[in-house]
């Protein structure tokens, strides 16, 4: 699933392609993707004539800011956007097409069909699901060491499980939680409430650093991820633990191990991240 660095990269690349384009029509081939409004024809009619003023991001969600509405889109496992001409061949996995007045098309393709779209009146998107219960952005002033300490002070959950919960801090998924915990020297099965202030400080720093470097590299293309221009990310070449089971740790040469934490495959170095 695309995490914050991938979604941010898609946002940046798409914005260059579709900003100020006006929607002439919309074709929805898989109505189940449209969650709000629940009437697909109304979804289409509301979008006609709307111009894309900006594209924002909230956690792992893309926010297409229009004249009167905000389209909230989640890519889920394998969703992707791309700009095409009407003569370009459509893949069988293309499920939503936004046709612009200049003749170009923004296409949404999704092999798994798990992606979702919600259309809200501008200003209402943050007080409605799915955005209403999201935590703070990791690059915001609200993301502090104290926030992590207070949020996890009484939890019995493993630190990895706690970080994956989007209600405290958003955008973190399997890849970047594993990487941040490695760089902070914290075992993923440590109870979150057992971390010291120094460990929280290191974790806070490594979350921000890891995400920043991943964005600079265009995200991680582990399976099918590409950005809005169809380009793969390069951060997978910098991963220290994720997807490196039985390979030597870059710091100490110990074999990377894989376990399951909270139902998620989890990679760590048993030497650099000692068990609790």
UniProtKB/Swiss-Prot annotation:
- FPG-type zinc finger segments: 240-274
A biological process from GO: base-excision repair
Q: Which residues are the active-site ones?
A: 2-3, 60, 264
Tell me its cofactors. Answer: Zn(2+)
Highest taxon listed in the record's lineage: Bacteria
Alphabetic keyword roster: DNA damage, DNA repair, DNA-binding, Glycosidase, Hydrolase, Lyase, Metal-binding, Multifunctional enzyme, Zinc, Zinc-finger
- Tell me what reaction this enzyme catalyses: Hydrolysis of DNA containing ring-opened 7-methylguanine residues, releasing 2,6-diamino-4-hydroxy-5-(N-methyl)formamidopyrimidine; 2'-deoxyribonucleotide-(2'-deoxyribose 5'-phosphate)-2'-deoxyribonucleotide-DNA = a 3'-end 2'-deoxyribonucleotide-(2,3-dehydro-2,3-deoxyribose 5'-phosphate)-DNA + a 5'-end 5'-phospho-2'-deoxyribonucleoside-DNA + H(+)
* Residues holding DNA: 93, 112
List GO molecular-function terms, semicolon-separated: 8-oxo-7,8-dihydroguanine DNA N-glycosylase activity; class I DNA-(apurinic or apyrimidinic site) endonuclease activity; damaged DNA binding; zinc ion binding
Comment on bound cofactor:
Binds 1 zinc ion per subunit.
- As recorded in UniProt, its EC number(s) are 3.2.2.23, 4.2.99.18
What's the stated role of this polypeptide?
Answer: Involved in base excision repair of DNA damaged by oxidation or by mutagenic agents. Acts as a DNA glycosylase that recognizes and removes damaged bases. Has a preference for oxidized purines, such as 7,8-dihydro-8-oxoguanine (8-oxoG). Has AP (apurinic/apyrimidinic) lyase activity and introduces nicks in the DNA strand. Cleaves the DNA backbone by beta-delta elimination to generate a single-strand break at the site of the removed base with both 3'- and 5'-phosphates.
Q: Which family does it belong to?
A: Belongs to the FPG family.
Q: How does it assemble?
A: Monomer.
Q: What is this protein called?
A: Formamidopyrimidine-DNA glycosylase
* Gene transcribed to yield this protein: mutM
